[in-house]
């Protein structure tokens, strides 16, 4: 009997283990951290052996194949041992893809992928399609393949997930943009990160679709290097050569495969960055054969994504906005660009090799003060202190950061949490960071 070992027992790992068990494999799960009770219950319910707080090497090195959590680096010692002995290491998405014939709509990019994924799912669901939401958001793809059997899956893919995908094929691949992110996981080499993102197009054929932002200089430069066989669907902010979707005379226009248009002001999502998200989602729905009426309705009634430019409250004339999902500099750039008032910016956390020059001009123009929130703020001091803005440093947690920002902000201004960094120095996740921000804002 083939032995499958799953490393990591979060949403993706637990789901992969259930699918492996359902398919009749000898299955073992190992997590170096504590496993959440809900995943223990799931594993126990399927009779799957597991361990937590350690990796027992003899159990793991005996695997015929390993399904690895995207959070485990490829250069972790145990992963290197497995590679040395020739054990195949794959992602949960790769594993799940073997056991379904459903259409796969896959979205990646440095920014905008969660909003775009959620919007595509909303359009498909609203149109009455049998669709699942998976990847970085929603339920484990493997668990859904084991238990639910959808006709379509809309999947948000990080570069880490793409790294361990080999035969998986996206029917529709969407690449929103590429800006520096996670370079600490890619030997601080931008080309390695770019190559990971373009893996979303591997295995595509001329029957498949590749949707991408035509204004992204890196994507345009790299297109010819990757032997893309899929039909190309480029989109841009304005009508330009090659683009099949754009805005013209305040109308969203999609020219292929079926002509589509709607008034830009009817879009539920506002701001330039959200225009790109809406264009990519509109093309995806168009390719899936969803009616123009259903696409228009869903693009106009979408509710947005939590922790992404989420309006929290107005306290004594000061607006508070939660953009905790901004874990890189480019995300913060989009957030600052959308600000219409002077802004107190809360930033900081686990730096991933950030270059803050990208937001320097916007910080000068838009910000009235800065709050550094993190255990190690030396890089922020080094870059931003010279701008001469009032600065508060907080190393204790979100409560003190919110109070510091509130004191610095004036009536009519905005406090924006848009950290540019990962959350893992003081918080469990970007969701935890955002929830704490909202909690302490409401306690002001």
From Swiss-Prot:
Catalysis performed (reactions): UDP-N-acetyl-alpha-D-muramoyl-L-alanine + D-glutamate + ATP = UDP-N-acetyl-alpha-D-muramoyl-L-alanyl-D-glutamate + ADP + phosphate + H(+)
Main location: cytoplasm
Subcellular location: Cytoplasm
Membrane-spanning residues: none
Pathway the protein contributes to: Cell wall biogenesis; peptidoglycan biosynthesis
GO CC annotation terms, alphabetical: cytoplasm
GO biological process, one term: peptidoglycan biosynthetic process
Gene Ontology terms, MF aspect: ATP binding; UDP-N-acetylmuramoylalanine-D-glutamate ligase activity
Top EC class for this record: ligase
Positions of ATP binding: 109-115
EC number: 6.3.2.9
Alphabetical keyword list: ATP-binding, Cell cycle, Cell division, Cell shape, Cell wall biogenesis/degradation, Cytoplasm, Ligase, Nucleotide-binding, Peptidoglycan synthesis
Coiled-coil annotated residue ranges, if any: none
Matching SUPFAM superfamilies: MurCD N-terminal domain, MurD-like peptide ligases, catalytic domain, MurD-like peptide ligases, peptide-binding domain
Function according to Swiss-Prot or TrEMBL: Cell wall formation. Catalyzes the addition of glutamate to the nucleotide precursor UDP-N-acetylmuramoyl-L-alanine (UMA).
Sequence similarity: Belongs to the MurCDEF family.
PANTHER family cross-referenced by the UniProt entry: UDP-N-ACETYLMURAMOYLALANINE--D-GLUTAMATE LIGASE
Protein name: UDP-N-acetylmuramoylalanine--D-glutamate ligase
Native species: Bacteroides fragilis (strain ATCC 25285 / DSM 2151 / CCUG 4856 / JCM 11019 / LMG 10263 / NCTC 9343 / Onslow / VPI 2553 / EN-2)
Gene name of the record: murD
């Amino acid at each position: 009997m083939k032995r499958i070992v799953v490393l990591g027992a979060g949403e993706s790992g637990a789901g992969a283990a259930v699918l492996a068990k359902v398919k009749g494999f000898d299955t073992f799960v190992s997590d170096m951290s504590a496993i959440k009770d809900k995943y223990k219950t799931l594993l126990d319910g399927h009779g799957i052996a597991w361990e937590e707080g350690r990796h027992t090497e003899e159990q793991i090195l005996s695997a015929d194949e390993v399904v690895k959590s995207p959070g485990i680096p490829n250069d972790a010692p145990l992963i290197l041992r497995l590679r040395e002995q020739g054990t195949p290491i794959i992602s949960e998405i790769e594993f799940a893809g073997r056991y379904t014939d459903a259409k796969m709509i896959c979205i990646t990019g440095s920014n905008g992928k969660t909003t775009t994924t959620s919007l595509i799912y909303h359009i498909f669901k609203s149109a009455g399609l049998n669709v699942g939401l998976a990847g970085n958001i929603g339920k484990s793809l493997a668990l859904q393949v084991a238990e639910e059997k959808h006709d379509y899956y809309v999947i948000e893919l990080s570069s880490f997930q793409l790294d361990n995908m080999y035969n998986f094929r996206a029917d529709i691949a969407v690449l929103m943009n590429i800006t520096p992110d996670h370079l600490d996981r890619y030997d601080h080499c931008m080309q390695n990160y770019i190559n990971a993102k373009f893996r979303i197009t591997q295995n595509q054929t001329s029957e498949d679709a590749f949707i991408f932002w035509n204004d992204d200089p890196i994507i345009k430069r790299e297109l010819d290097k990757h032997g893309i066989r899929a039909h190309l669907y480029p989109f841009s902010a304005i009508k330009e050569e090659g683009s099949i979707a754009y805005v013209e005379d305040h109308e969203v226009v999609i020219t292929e495969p079926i002509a589509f248009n709607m008034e830009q002001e009817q879009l539920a999502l506002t701001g330039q960055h959200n225009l790109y998200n809406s264009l990519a989602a509109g093309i995806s729905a168009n390719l899936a054969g969803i009616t123009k009426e259903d696409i228009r309705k869903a693009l106009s009634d979408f509710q947005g994504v939590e922790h992404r430019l989420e309006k929290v409250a107005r306290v004594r004339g000061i607006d508070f906005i939660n953009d905790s999902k901004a874990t890189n500099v480019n995300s913060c750039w989009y957030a600052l660009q959308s600000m219409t008032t002077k802004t107190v910016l809360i930033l900081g956390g686990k730096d991933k090799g950030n270059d803050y020059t990208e937001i320097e001009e916007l910080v000068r123009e838009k910000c009235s003060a800065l709050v550094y929130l993190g255990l190690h703020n030396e890089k922020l001091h080094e870059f931003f202190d010279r701008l001469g803005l009032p600065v508060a440093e907080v190393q204790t947690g979100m409560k003190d950061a919110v109070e510091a920002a509130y004191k610095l902000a004036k009536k009519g201004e905005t406090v924006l949490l848009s950290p540019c960094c990962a959350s893992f120095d003081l918080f469990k996740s970007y969701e935890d960071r955002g929830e704490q921000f909202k909690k302490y804002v409401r306690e002001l």
